[in-house]
Amino acid sequence: MSDMNNPSDENTGALDDLWADALNEQKATTTKSAADAVFQQLGGGDVSGAMQDIDLIMDIPVKLTVELGRTRMTIKELLRLTQGSVVALDGLAGEPLDILINGYLIAQGEVVVVADKYGVRITDIITPSERMRRLSR
């Protein structure tokens, strides 16, 4: 009966051969680096494919909101509001209006009248760095 913890010399040689075969197989199958597997090579890919991807999102609806201003009030003040009440806002008259898409500030503009309806003329597009600065307030 052989001891499992102390293999014989012929078993040791066979075991070494198995380990060597396994290591050689592993080296042969892992010639690519992990970065090659994760990242694809950038290049002059198919531009029409990218345009098709953009076309997929073109019909997604977004909510555009134009804010005159904001204010804070207590529930008591809110409940006291009646028809004809005036609520003072923090925006000043003539100050640019905030234009938001889905709640995120993207531009500023001014009120215009278009065919007897209100409209907004965009006067300034907010840069990504400006958006980040405003979000951190």
UniProtKB/Swiss-Prot annotation:
Keywords: Bacterial flagellum, Cell inner membrane, Cell membrane, Chemotaxis, Flagellar rotation, Membrane. This is Flagellar motor switch protein FliN. GO terms for cellular component: bacterial-type flagellum basal body; plasma membrane. It is a peripheral membrane protein. GO terms for molecular function: cytoskeletal motor activity. FliN is one of three proteins (FliG, FliN, FliM) that form the rotor-mounted switch complex (C ring), located at the base of the basal body. This complex interacts with the CheY and CheZ chemotaxis proteins, in addition to contacting components of the motor that determine the direction of flagellar rotation. The keyword Ribosomal protein does not apply. Pfam families: FliMN_C, FliN_N. PANTHER family: FLAGELLAR MOTOR SWITCH PROTEIN FLIN, PTHR43484. Belongs to the FliN/MopA/SpaO family. One of its GO terms (biological process) is bacterial-type flagellum-dependent cell motility. It comes from the Bacteria. It is found in: Cell inner membrane; Bacterial flagellum basal body. The gene is fliN.
